[in-house]
Amino acid sequence: MDFNQYFLPLFQGEASLIINKKVEEFKLFDRKNKDALFEELCFCILAANTSARMALDMQNRIGKGFLYLSENELREKLKAFKYRFYNVRPRYIVESRDIVDELPYIVSMDNKEEARDLLVENVYGFGYKEASHFLRNVGVFDFAILDKHILEWLSRYFQVKKNTSRKNYLYNESIFREIAKSVGMEPGVLDLYIWYMETGTVIK
């Protein structure tokens, strides 16, 4: 399949203006600001298996509270704001605070695969999707965020692995990387185009 022709209307249309603006926003993220990095990390913890819009709402409401509120305080806030997983995610956030001081180093590592592995190993609630999401949102576009929308699209053209083990995620991502390479685009940027195509919007 010629993906250059497939994506051409999308790359030349209104979507490109929206996505280019979002990409520039990600590139400008202050990767030396450990507190801002942790707030973004918490957004990605909260976005897993729920909507990005809901997670963004929680991030806007709680903000720096991610850094200091107790597990019970976070639980009460998330419950009051009608966040779905208000019981479990506060523990993920509190137990992930140990990594705050290391975040500027991790996101600036030359070896991005190693950086992602460190996040998966050290952030509670993070798998490869969540770690890729976080890195993309702070300006690292090396990876695909293989959520349900992207996997649904990918499965129309390729046989994808269904469960979310490391091996299967990397297998599916390798397919996505080849598509991105064929159209001359970083995986984390092409991901935004497909997400826009599937949902009609771009959040983050």
UniProtKB/Swiss-Prot annotation:
Optimum temperature is 60 degrees Celsius. Pfam families: Ogg-HhH (PF22175). The active site is at 129, 147. Keywords: DNA damage, DNA repair, Glycosidase, Hydrolase, Lyase, Multifunctional enzyme. Its EC number is 3.2.2.-, 4.2.99.18. The keyword DNA damage applies. Optimum pH is about 7.5. It catalyses: 2'-deoxyribonucleotide-(2'-deoxyribose 5'-phosphate)-2'-deoxyribonucleotide-DNA = a 3'-end 2'-deoxyribonucleotide-(2,3-dehydro-2,3-deoxyribose 5'-phosphate)-DNA + a 5'-end 5'-phospho-2'-deoxyribonucleoside-DNA + H(+). InterPro entries: DNA_glyclase/AP_lyase_Ogg, DNA_glycosylase, HhH-GPD_domain, HhH_base_excis_C. One of its GO terms (biological process) is base-excision repair. The record marks 204 as: Important for guanine/8-oxoguanine distinction. One of its GO terms (molecular function) is class I DNA-(apurinic or apyrimidinic site) endonuclease activity. Catalyzes the excision of an oxidatively damaged form of guanine (7,8-dihydro-8-oxoguanine = 8-oxoG) from DNA. Also cleaves the DNA backbone at apurinic/apyrimidinic sites (AP sites). Prefers oligomers containing 8-oxoG:C, 8-oxoG:T and 8-oxoG:G base pairs, and is less effective on oligomers containing 8-oxoG:A mispairs. Belongs to the type-2 OGG1 family. This is 8-oxoguanine DNA glycosylase/AP lyase. It comes from Thermoplasma volcanium (strain ATCC 51530 / DSM 4299 / JCM 9571 / NBRC 15438 / GSS1).
